[in-house]
Amino acid sequence: MSDTRTAAMTSKAWPFEEARRVLKRYEKNPPEKGYVLFETGYGPSGLPHIGTFGEVARTSMVMRAFQEISDIPTRLICFSDDLDGMRKVPGNVPNPDALTEHLQRPLTSVPDPFGTHASFGAHNNAMLRRFLDTFGFEYEFISATEFYNTGQFDEILLRAAAKYDEIMAVMLKSLREERRQTYSIFLPIHPESGRVMYVPMKEVNAQAGTITFDSEDGEEMTLPVTGGAVKLQWKPDFGARWAALGVDFEMYGKDHSTNTPIYDKICRILGQRPPEHFTYELFLDENGQKISKSSGNGVSIDEWLTYASTESLSYFMYQKPKTAKRMYFDVIPKAVDEYHQQLRAYAGQDTAQRLNNPVWHIHGGDVPASNMLVPFSMLLNLASVSSAEDKSQLWGFIQRYAPESNPENNPDMDAAADFAVRYFNDFVKPKKVYRAASDLEREALEDLRDQLKAYDGPVDDEALQSIVYACGRERFDPLRGWFTALYEVLLGASQGPRFGGFIALYGVQETVALIDAALAGELLSDD
């Protein structure tokens, strides 16, 4: 056994902990199907949101961890529930009123409001796949519509008809009395209107593989359960899909957790072993509300990628999946800088430490070196004091700090400068509020200015930080009040960088001029 595999078998990183649970399923015999199957499900009722991406990213991390501890082949399936009826019209699509007449039709039978695909479901599936492809995920996409219509689900549907009473008994226990009267695990699709019907069954004929029911307008109908004429209610569908595909691992949000025993029982009734599952906490927007596909709150994948790299988003997804996290624009700079801190740490770590480092899981063990010369938060401060409209303005500061660097030989730094200018103009600039210095703060700022004016030492972060400390230590206890003053008076922000590093990048004499402008009240007019 290699050193890496040995370390992986005891690693406390959560993807390895999950991978070991999956491996335990096959400690006696390998899977009959010849591979271990990881699955993620996607409900394409609205535009794909960042939580959807997170599920695939995290599942991929578990699959990659499994590959490190086992030689059994793996597959990752992304399954889209696009045969679901459209229950309500999403608010974040063009011409929503035009979709009203298509309520209750499968999403793949609803016209695409964007006018680019054969259906709304196809549009949203394409959006999801584009996002996943951007991140280089290796996955197989399965459409529920295709899965049902091409007969791939037929064997399980016929088994569900044969086990109808058993599955119904599981479901009825979970329903309120009034719902029990009309509930059926089978949802017929009206042959003419195309609508998914929620009607009780008059007969389920397992031998013939048919169901008989009265349609919503009172007409008695008999349909085969096979070939896409009928779909399963979503809870039975969950367990049935596990059985049909032989799923070994699936993760889903906390909102599904109470249904897990139902999914498991149905999978067993249909003759298969349920998968290992992992429940993650939900993402919240800045107001603490759950991010939802249909309302479009929170940060979209495209929005994150407007302001930061794909790796920073993967880093955010790795962190504490069982803790509810607010996901809004303010978290982006922290995610970028922490990701690069972990990259820099990785080079000096031993095997066990590397396997516990988030970047191992983000990059699947093939971890690059960080070439982020200047932290993202520092770039934002430089953009702030220079009112940067273009990344070339930031490169002037970057090259002062690292003369050998340029956009051509450091494309990652170039991209970060571009992201920082965008982020500054969209989020920092509108919120900038400068304030005047108090008498004590003015005295300290004048002292700092005078010491910087007279400074003829090296442009070194630590040397300059010592001057900043000295000016504050004589006057402020705790020292935090001094740094808060620097940020609020000079940068118009509530927090900021290590100030010595800021001076080194921005320039000593430029910082002197900035202090003079602040003390003269010139920055207050920007408010």
From Swiss-Prot:
<dbReference type="GO" id="GO:0000049">
    <property type="term" value="F:tRNA binding"/>
</dbReference>
<dbReference type="InterPro" id="IPR001412">
    <property type="entry name" value="aa-tRNA-synth_I_CS"/>
</dbReference>
<dbReference type="GO" id="GO:0005524">
    <property type="term" value="F:ATP binding"/>
</dbReference>
<keyword id="KW-0030">Aminoacyl-tRNA synthetase</keyword>
<feature type="short sequence motif" description="'HIGH' region">
    <location>
        <begin position="44"/>
        <end position="52"/>
    </location>
</feature>
<keyword id="KW-0547">Nucleotide-binding</keyword>
<dbReference type="GO" id="GO:0006430">
    <property type="term" value="P:lysyl-tRNA aminoacylation"/>
</dbReference>
<keyword id="KW-0648">Protein biosynthesis</keyword>
<feature type="binding site">
    <location>
        <position position="293"/>
    </location>
    <ligand>
        <name>ATP</name>
    </ligand>
</feature>
<feature type="short sequence motif" description="'KMSKS' region">
    <location>
        <begin position="290"/>
        <end position="294"/>
    </location>
</feature>
<keyword id="KW-0436">Ligase</keyword>
<dbReference type="GO" id="GO:0004824">
    <property type="term" value="F:lysine-tRNA ligase activity"/>
</dbReference>
<comment type="similarity">
    <text>Belongs to the class-I aminoacyl-tRNA synthetase family.</text>
</comment>
<keyword id="KW-0067">ATP-binding</keyword>
<protein>
    <recommendedName>
        <fullName>Lysine--tRNA ligase</fullName>
        <ecNumber>6.1.1.6</ecNumber>
    </recommendedName>
</protein>
<dbReference type="Pfam" id="PF01921">
    <property type="entry name" value="tRNA-synt_1f"/>
</dbReference>
<keyword id="KW-0963">Cytoplasm</keyword>
<dbReference type="InterPro" id="IPR020751">
    <property type="entry name" value="aa-tRNA-synth_I_codon-bd_sub2"/>
</dbReference>
<dbReference type="GO" id="GO:0005737">
    <property type="term" value="C:cytoplasm"/>
</dbReference>
<dbReference type="InterPro" id="IPR014729">
    <property type="entry name" value="Rossmann-like_a/b/a_fold"/>
</dbReference>
<dbReference type="InterPro" id="IPR008925">
    <property type="entry name" value="aa_tRNA-synth_I_cd-bd_sf"/>
</dbReference>
<dbReference type="InterPro" id="IPR002904">
    <property type="entry name" value="Lys-tRNA-ligase"/>
</dbReference>
